[in-house]
Structure formats: C-alpha cells, structure tokens
C-alpha cells in the first residue's frame, strides 16, 4: 500500500480511495505527531467520498509511563501519548450525529454523557484490550463482561447506537479480547463477533430509534439535575468524608 502525509496525519491512501469507490465510510486510528511536537492517540472519521469529516484525540490514557519489569508485557501508553485537550465532540455525518471514542474511553460514563448532551446517535469506538490485566489478574475472567457492560450502559443511558470494534487474536504473545459489538439504544447487542480472527459483523442501525429513549426515560431537558452533579467536574480523585 502507498502511504502519504496529510498535514500532520499519516493516512493509507488506498483505504480512502476504496471507501470512495464503494461509497462506505470508516474510522482510522493512528499515532499523531502534531507540528508543535505533541503526540496523541487519534481517530479520524472518513465519509463515503473518502473525505475526513471528523477527528478525535483520546482523552482517557491508561497504563504507565515507565517500564515495570514484573509485568508479562508493558502497557506504556502514558509514555507515548498525551491526554487530549479537546474533549469529546460530535459531527454531522452519515445522516446522523456521530461521536468517537478510543479503547479506555469506553469504560468511563462521562464519555457517553458528554456525547449524549450533544445529541449523539452513533458512537464509534475502537479498542485493543489484552485478556490479561496485570494490576489485578482477578479481573481477567471478567474482561468480556466488563466490555459489554460499559458499552451497553452507555448506549442505553444516552439513547444512542454504539459500535465497538476490537482487535482480536494473539500478537507478540499477548491475547486480545476481540468481541466487536453493535449495540442498540435499548442496550441490546444486535450483532457481535464470536471469533478472535478477522470477521465482519453488520446490523441495520435505525437512528430514529434513539428518539424512543432521548424523548422518554432519558429526556435530559426534563430530568437531568446538573446542579446535583457539580462534584463530577470540580473533583478528580476520591475524597471520602472525614471522621
């Protein structure tokens, strides 16, 4: 494949050309180096003409910055990437309101709520999750459960479709979760990968279904109480009561 540089972004030109030929869109994740030297874990949204219509930089950076010899493998994302200063934004694309998130972002409810407050109807998430979690291996058997839990909850509580696309299989001895999913605004999984190799899953995503939840149980304008949630943005870590 030929590669090219578009500003500070490296793209695989043939993928863009093929998207335009087929009339389909896609997301592409890459390591971004900005002209002023910042490094981000970045995602672009490409429409059916092959044009970039959205860009997102990862907010929640997991892992560690220094080598930890006791680990069977290193998770050095915090060494190589900075936290995004941009937050979560949506774009109008594919006839709806689309938001993006990357990997660890999917575990945080704030991700979906910030997008939900902008009317998101389709959240696109790419993730690469090892089956082994070194800080607490007792969570290993729960990886699939937790993966579904966070994306289904985010979909339901914000009345949006969620498409989670996973990297599966074994690379350099590390097994990844896989389990790509398409989740409806009801929180129901309507399509899921059941193998760890390359596989295509699909579903018809009726964006009008989002209104069933956005205009009823999760009508934010009627039921949300921002004044009761101030601690969420005013405080970062846990602060137990004294005494």
Model features per residue range: what roles?
Residues 26, 92-94, 118, 230, ...:
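RNA-binding accessory domains that recognize and position tRNA/RNA substrates
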Residues 33-135, 139-149, 215-219:
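Active-site catalytic loop in hydrolytic enzyme cores
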Residues 16, 22-35, 152, 158, ...:
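Short, basic/aromatic recognition patches
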Residues 28-30, 42-45, 89, 180-182, ...:
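Short beta-strand scaffold segments in enzyme catalytic cores
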Residues 1-7, 11-12:
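Single conserved hydrophobic/aromatic residue that forms the stacking wall/gate
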Residues 20-26, 37-40, 84, 102, ...:
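Short, basic and Ser/Thr-rich N-terminal targeting/leader segments
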Residues 153-154, 160-243:
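C-terminal beta-strand edge segments of enzyme domains
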Residues 8, 19, 26-27, 105, ...:
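Active-site beta-strand/loop signature of hydrolases that rely on acidic residues for catalysis
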């Amino acid at each position: 494949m030929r590669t090219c540089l578009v500003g500070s972004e490296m793209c695989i030109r043939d993928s863009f050309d093929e998207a335009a030929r087929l009339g389909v869109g896609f997301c592409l994740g890459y390591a971004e180096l900005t002209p002023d030297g910042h490094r981000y874990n970045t995602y672009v949204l490409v429409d059916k003409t092959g044009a970039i219509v959205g860009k997102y930089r990862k907010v929640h950076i997991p892992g560690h910055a220094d080598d930890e010899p006791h680990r069977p493998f290193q998770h050095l994302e915090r060494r190589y990437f900075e936290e995004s200063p941009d937050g979560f934004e949506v774009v109008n694309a594919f006839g709806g309101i689309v938001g993006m998130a990357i990997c660890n972002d999917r575990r945080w409810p704030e991700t979906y709520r910030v997008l939900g407050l902008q009317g998101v109807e389709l959240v696109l998430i790419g993730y690469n999750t090892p089956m082994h979690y070194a800080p607490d291996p007792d969570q290993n058997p729960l990886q699939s459960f937790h993966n579904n839990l966070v994306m289904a909850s985010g979909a339901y509580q914000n009345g949006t479709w969620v498409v989670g696309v996973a990297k599966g299989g074994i690379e350099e001895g590390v097994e990844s979760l896989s389990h790509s999913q398409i989740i409806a605004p009801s929180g129901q999984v309507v399509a899921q990968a059941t193998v760890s190799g390359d596989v295509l899953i699909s579903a018809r995503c009726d964006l009008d279904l989002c209104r069933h939840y956005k205009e009823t149980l999760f009508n934010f304008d009627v039921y949300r109480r921002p004044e009761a949630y101030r601690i969420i943005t005013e405080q970062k870590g846990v602060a137990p009561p004294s005494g």
